Amino acid sequence: RIVLLASSSVKQPVANLHLSNGIRPGLVGFMKSMADEVSADGVTVNSILPGVILTDRITNNAKLAAKNQNITLEQRLDNMTATIPARRFGRPDEVAEAVAFLASEKASYITGATLQVDGGLIRSNF
């Protein structure tokens, strides 16, 4: 089993992440091509598209943005979650559970797929 950890930017560009917005869709395209080549051998190849997952990186970036915007960290975090239909950040363990599923025998007929773990952040139907 191969599971690529990509980004929601594959389907919906993220502001000011130009490099990520350009490169990650290409990696998922590569993943799809690999799935075509190795699936007959019983190898599955899938990718996870995490949304905004509450990690130290997100917290540190939010602190900097709050300072630059002259607002509290709590206000900045509230502003961020307001853009997510689930109205909360994802947790690292939620992404880990999705990876574990795709790496398991239960996902043996799933290949070439992208799984969004984003609380509804990605607005695309596809």
Question: Which functions belong to the PLM regions below?
Answer:
Residues 1-27, 31-40, 52-53:
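Catalytic loop of short-chain dehydrogenase/reductase
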Residues 12, 99-100, 111-126:
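Short C-terminal tail/terminal secondary-structure segment
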Residues 14-16, 58-60, 126:
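Conserved catalytic-core motifs of eukaryotic protein kinase domains, centered on the activation segment
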Residues 31-32, 96-99, 103:
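Short-chain dehydrogenase/reductase
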Residues 39, 44, 110-112:
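Short, small/polar-rich loop/turn modules that mediate ligand/substrate recognition or access, typified
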Residues 69-73, 84-95, 106:
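A conserved structural motif in NAD(P)-dependent oxidoreductases
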